Every structure is written in structure tokens, then in C-alpha cells.
């Protein structure tokens, strides 16, 4: 009986050791699904290859089904790092108490959301009263939380102000809904809007921006708090070393819609936490 118990214990220890060894050799990375999965993977591939070179280890992109899945995976150490919106970071930080935001794009310190419509008669939110409206994901900082927060500050409660609100699930989907006439207006993050316009994926002769939110902090790359501090520091340095004057680096930065990456800290997202509490999205 004792020999069997020891054998089981040894087998468990070996399995655990192998798991930890595997985890140490592979950096598991994900991102909030604010765009189509194929687009997220396309944007990450060159960055992942760069990180592999800089870190000397395999980097694996792990897609997730929704925003809560990223929070849960980071909190349970099934992910090492993730690209998060400001609100998702707040959720992870409150859940774990130790998640670390490493870097953000330069523009994420002054991020905005764009209100769009295909109705030529809509010049402001006042013109959308009693009409239909779309947010992105309910957990999106730039596609839901912050636009909602600024609307509430202006005395607009979306649930009663609009005849119907919908959640498209992603910024590009919101633009598609508006262009197709599925809703009268919508809101999405400024970076995705600019990318869709540049790629010709939205008809600007039909869809227009009629308002922009005030600025707020948003996206960042966050690592789990239990990650080896030396590895976390290497990751941060790798991001900060991306130089737009280097053609290879610029290609990576362009896919991330970044001019460059800068350091960030948890305190930067206090305003987002306050907005989430004001909207009763945090208890």
C-alpha cells in the first residue's frame, strides 16, 4: 500500500515537473477578442516571432472565446501574457491582486472612441434619441464602458435613450452593423476605425464619424503576477526596444497600430475602475 502511494506520488511529481518545465519553455499569450480571430492572429504573428528571438523561448498565441475567458485564464495561470483593454485589465487586477501591466502603445495614454452612423441626418447623439444603437462587447473599454460612462455624464442612459441597443461583440462588427443599416448608430475604438478606413473596409461615403469621446487610458500588455520577474522584465525591454526606424520593427509596430510602446502602471487605470463602478459593472 505504501509502495503504491509512493509510486502515485512520484508519478504526480513527475507529471507536475513536466508541466512546469513545459510552461517554462513556452510563453502562452492571448488577446481580448475585439476583432475577428484571424485578424488577431495575423497581427500577432510577427510580434510573436520577434519575442521568440528576444526571449530565447517559444511563444504561443492562444485564442479565447470571449473577454471573461482572458480574465479567467490569466487568473489561473493558463496564460502568461495578454493584450487587454483597460477595463479587462481592471477586472484581472481586481481578481488576482497582482497582474502586472508592462507596456502600452503611446496612443493608449490618450485613447478615444468614435461614434459613427450611416444616417446623413445624424449630427450628434441628440439626433439618435429613440433610434437603435450598437456597442461592441459589453466588456470592451473603448466599445462600451467609456462611451457609456461619457454618455451617462451627459445625462444619457442608453437603455432608455435609444429604442434598442445591441452588442456586436467586436469593433469591426459594430462598423459592419452600422454600414449595413442594422443599427442607426454605434461606437468603436478610434484605432480600429482608422484601420478599417485605411484598409477600405468601411465605406466613408456612407459611414461617418459624428462625435469623439474625451481621452482615457486603454490597452496594455499584461503579464500574470506569478510570472518570473526576470522574464517579465525581458518582455518589457523587448517591447520598449521596438524602434520605428528599424524596418522590421516598424512592420511589427504597424500591425499593432503603434508608433512605439511605453511603460505603464496599474494607477493609470484607476479612472476606468471608477467608470466601471459608476456603471455598476464592478461590485
In which residue ranges do the predicted regions lie?
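Short helices/loops that flank or line small-molecule/ion binding pockets
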Residues: 68-82, 95-96, 126-129, 170-191
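Pocket-lining segment of extracytoplasmic ligand-binding domains
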Residues: 131-230
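An extracytoplasmic/periplasmic, membrane-proximal ligand-sensing/linker region
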Residues: 24-31, 35-46, 216-218, 222-283
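Bacterial N-terminal signal peptides
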Residues: 9-17
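Flexible hinge/capping segments at coil-to-helix
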Residues: 117-137
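Hydrophobic/proline-rich hinge and linker segments of small-molecule sensing/allosteric domains
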Residues: 102-124, 221-224
Amino acid at each position: 500500500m505504501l509502495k503504491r502511494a509512493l509510486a502515485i506520488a512520484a508519478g504526480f511529481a513527475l507529471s507536475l515537473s513536466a508541466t512546469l518545465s513545459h510552461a517554462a519553455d513556452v510563453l502562452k499569450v492571448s488577446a481580448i477578442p475585439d476583432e475577428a480571430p484571424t485578424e488577431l492572429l495575423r497581427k500577432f504573428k510577427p510580434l510573436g516571432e520577434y519575442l521568440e528571438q528576444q526571449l530565447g523561448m517559444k511563444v504561443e498565441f492562444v485564442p479565447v472565446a470571449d473577454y471573461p475567458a482572458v480574465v479567467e485564464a490569466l487568473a489561473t495561470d493558463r496564460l502568461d501574457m495578454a493584450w487587454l483593454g483597460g477595463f479587462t485589465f481592471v477586472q484581472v487586477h481586481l481578481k488576482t491582486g497582482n497582474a502586472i501591466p508592462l507596456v502600452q502603445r503611446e496612443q493608449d495614454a490618450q485613447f478615444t472612441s468614435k461614434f459613427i452612423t450611416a444616417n446623413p441626418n445624424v449630427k450628434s447623439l441628440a439626433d439618435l434619441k429613440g433610434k437603435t444603437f450598437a456597442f461592441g462587447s459589453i466588456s470592451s473599454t473603448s466599445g462600451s464602458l467609456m462611451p457609456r460612462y461619457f454618455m451617462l455624464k451627459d445625462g444619457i442612459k442608453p437603455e432608455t435613450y435609444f429604442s434598442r441597443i445591441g452588442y456586436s461583440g467586436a469593433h469591426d462588427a459594430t462598423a459592419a452593423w452600422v454600414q449595413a443599416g442594422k443599427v442607426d448608430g454605434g461606437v468603436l475604438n478610434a484605432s480600429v476605425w482608422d484601420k478599417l478606413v485605411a484598409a477600405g473596409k468601411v465605406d466613408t461615403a456612407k459611414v461617418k464619424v459624428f462625435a469623439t469621446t474625451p481621452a482615457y487610458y486603454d490597452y496594455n500588455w499584461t503579464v500574470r503576477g506569478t510570472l518570473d520577474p526576470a522574464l517579465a522584465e525581458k518582455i518589457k525591454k523587448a517591447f520598449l526596444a521596438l524602434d520605428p526606424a528599424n524596418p522590421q520593427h516598424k512592420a511589427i509596430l504597424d500591425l499593432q497600430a503603434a508608433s512605439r510602446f511605453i511603460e505603464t502602471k496599474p494607477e493609470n487605470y484607476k479612472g476606468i475602475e471608477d467608470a466601471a463602478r459608476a456603471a455598476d459593472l464592478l461590485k
